[in-house]
């Protein structure tokens, strides 16, 4: 891998639910060279609800800023910056809780943090060298979420739509969309905007000093 810089180059990728955040983050990692990139997903840092009954976990608002363990995420980013690997929690989307397993994230030249609220939380936002917001049409995002949650998370269309109306859309309007003003780069169409992603990658390579 070669010698790591004094501190990694941190990128925050935000946007609404199913806006293409993971697609863009993984594309950046692939094109920059995965050995250069540590990818951190905000979903891994949902607060631990293991002591609550499943019915209560089902009713939890996962789109509110209070749903995330910001101190743990900040501790992990500080450790990566100091050159230490970190045990990233793995989240179980079927049980609505941490699985108990972890994924070891290693220090890298570039650290990409992606999630709905990474530009909303001040303690996290101030760490980023580059802040990206994916501005994807709400209808497109809802369709993507329906397909994903039904296929991958054992949900029904009715429960997905109910959650969208009760928590996802209100949180987007109150927290996520307003955080766009903090972005250095706004990408329309999210992960489908290949030209914008290519330009972003070139800039990341330039700023981070990777080949």
Language model features: what each stretch is:
Residues 38, 47, 51-95:
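Conserved nucleotide-sensing/catalytic segment adjacent to the nucleotide-binding pocket
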Residues 99-153:
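ATP-dependent NMP and nucleoside kinases share a basic, alpha-helical "lid"
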Residues 24:
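Hydrophobic positions on the alpha1 helix immediately C-terminal to the Walker A/P-loop
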Residues 1-4, 106-107, 147-150, 169-211:
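NTP-dependent small-molecule kinase module
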Residues 21:
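Conserved lysine of the Walker
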Residues 16:
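P-loop (Walker A) phosphate-binding loop of NTP-binding proteins
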Residues 30-38:
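Post-Walker A helix-loop "phosphate-sensing" segment adjacent to the P-loop in P-loop NTPases
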């Amino acid at each position: 891998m070669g010698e790591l810089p004094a501190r990694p180059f941190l990128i925050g990728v935000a946007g609404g639910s199913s806006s293409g955040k993971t697609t863009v983050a993984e594309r950046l990692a692939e094109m920059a060279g995965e050995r250069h990139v540590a990818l951190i997903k905000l979903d891994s840092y949902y607060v631990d609800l293991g002591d609550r009954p499943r019915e209560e976990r089902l009713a939890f608002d996962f789109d509110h800023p209070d749903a995330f363990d910001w101190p743990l995420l900040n501790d992990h980013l500080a450790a990566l910056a100091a050159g230490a690997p970190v045990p990233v929690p793995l989240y179980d989307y079927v049980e609505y809780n941490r699985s108990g397993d972890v994924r070891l994230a290693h220090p890298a030249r570039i650290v990409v943090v992606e999630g709905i609220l990474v530009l909303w939380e001040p303690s996290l936002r101030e760490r980023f060298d580059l802040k990206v917001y994916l501005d994807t049409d709400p209808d497109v995002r809802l369709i993507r979420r329906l397909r994903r949650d039904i296929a991958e998370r054992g949900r029904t269309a009715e429960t997905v739509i109910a959650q969208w109306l009760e928590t996802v859309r209100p949180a987007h309007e109150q927290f996520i969309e307003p955080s766009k003003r903090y972005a250095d780069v706004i990408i329309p169409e999210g992960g489908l905007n290949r030209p914008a992603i290519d330009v972003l990658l070139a800039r990341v390579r330039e700023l981070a000093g990777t080949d």
